[in-house]
């Protein structure tokens, strides 16, 4: 097998632990959401996303209702673009004030640097907003890794479990699907990428998945427990 022309990676459960997102980022955004909306609700960018939330629930409602809705969506882990954008803005404040740094697995940081040094373009596709992705990599445990990434994609390119999203990404980066390796911990995402013609690898980390996924579940995807095990 020839080396891929590009590598596309997920974040949560792939480069980084699920627990960091669930136990640090989500609760931080939930706690900060009321004060953030009250303080910044008239800012055009914030209002744009709040209006999208109002459109989603189909009512002209006060901000307090929008705040409650957003907190409920956080609890439900909704992949709504407006929620992800607002979370990203809030996390930006947290990174800037050093309330936390983003978790990156050591093997992921090492391998991303090695691939970048070898001239393989790296791309990120996550349900988190592009600004949030950039902040995540810029303020990681391993330092500023944002310069390793050529481009970033979020759910504005499409849902992660639909093959059309991966075809759009391939078109945008100008690399044929079979020459792109997609890394994720979610089998349904890998299935969608494979239907779009991409190579795929399942990250099945014991820290995030104590019970290994079965061979039937993994199917034809390459399965690894760390980036160091990946075969290009």
Swiss-Prot record:
Pathway: Amino-acid biosynthesis; L-methionine biosynthesis via salvage pathway; L-methionine from S-methyl-5-thio-alpha-D-ribose 1-phosphate: step 3/6; Amino-acid biosynthesis; L-methionine biosynthesis via salvage pathway; L-methionine from S-methyl-5-thio-alpha-D-ribose 1-phosphate: step 4/6. GO terms for molecular function: 2,3-diketo-5-methylthiopentyl-1-phosphate enolase activity; 2-hydroxy-3-keto-5-methylthiopentenyl-1-phosphate phosphatase activity; acireductone synthase activity; magnesium ion binding. It catalyses: 5-methylsulfanyl-2,3-dioxopentyl phosphate + H2O = 1,2-dihydroxy-5-(methylsulfanyl)pent-1-en-3-one + phosphate. Binds 1 Mg(2+) ion per subunit. Its cofactor is Mg(2+). SUPFAM superfamilies: HAD-like. It comes from the Bacteria. Its EC number is 3.1.3.77. Keywords: Amino-acid biosynthesis, Hydrolase, Magnesium, Metal-binding, Methionine biosynthesis. GO terms for biological process: L-methionine salvage from methylthioadenosine. Monomer. Bifunctional enzyme that catalyzes the enolization of 2,3-diketo-5-methylthiopentyl-1-phosphate (DK-MTP-1-P) into the intermediate 2-hydroxy-3-keto-5-methylthiopentenyl-1-phosphate (HK-MTPenyl-1-P), which is then dephosphorylated to form the acireductone 1,2-dihydroxy-3-keto-5-methylthiopentene (DHK-MTPene). Belongs to the HAD-like hydrolase superfamily. MasA/MtnC family. This is Enolase-phosphatase E1. It comes from Xanthomonas euvesicatoria pv. vesicatoria (strain 85-10) (Xanthomonas campestris pv. vesicatoria).
């Amino acid at each position: 097998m020839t080396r891929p022309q590009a590598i596309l990676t997920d974040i949560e459960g792939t480069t980084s632990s699920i627990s960091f997102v669930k136990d640090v980022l989500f609760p931080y955004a939930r706690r900060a959401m009321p004060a953030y909306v009250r303080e910044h609700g008239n800012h055009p960018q914030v209002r744009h996303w709040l209006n999208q939330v109002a459109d989603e629930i189909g009512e002209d409602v006060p901000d307090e209702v929008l705040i409650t809705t957003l907190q409920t969506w956080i609890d439900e882990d909704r992949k709504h673009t407006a929620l992800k954008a607002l979370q990203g803005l809030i996390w930006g404040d947290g990174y800037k004030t050093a309330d936390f740094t983003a978790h990156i697995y050591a093997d992921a940081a090492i391998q991303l640097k090695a691939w970048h040094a070898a001239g393989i373009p790296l791309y990120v596709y996550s349900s988190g907003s592009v600004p949030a992705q950039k902040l995540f990599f810029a303020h990681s445990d391993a330092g500023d890794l944002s310069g390793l990434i050529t481009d970033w994609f979020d759910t504005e390119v499409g849902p992660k479990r639909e093959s059309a999203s991966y075809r759009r990404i391939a078109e945008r980066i100008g690399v044929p699907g079979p020459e792109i390796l997609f890394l994720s911990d979610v089998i349904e995402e890998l299935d969608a990428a494979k239907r779009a013609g991409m190579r795929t690898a399942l990250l099945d980390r014991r820290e995030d998945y104590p019970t290994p996924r079965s061979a039937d579940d993994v199917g034809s995807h390459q399965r690894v427990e760390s980036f160091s095990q990946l075969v290009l």
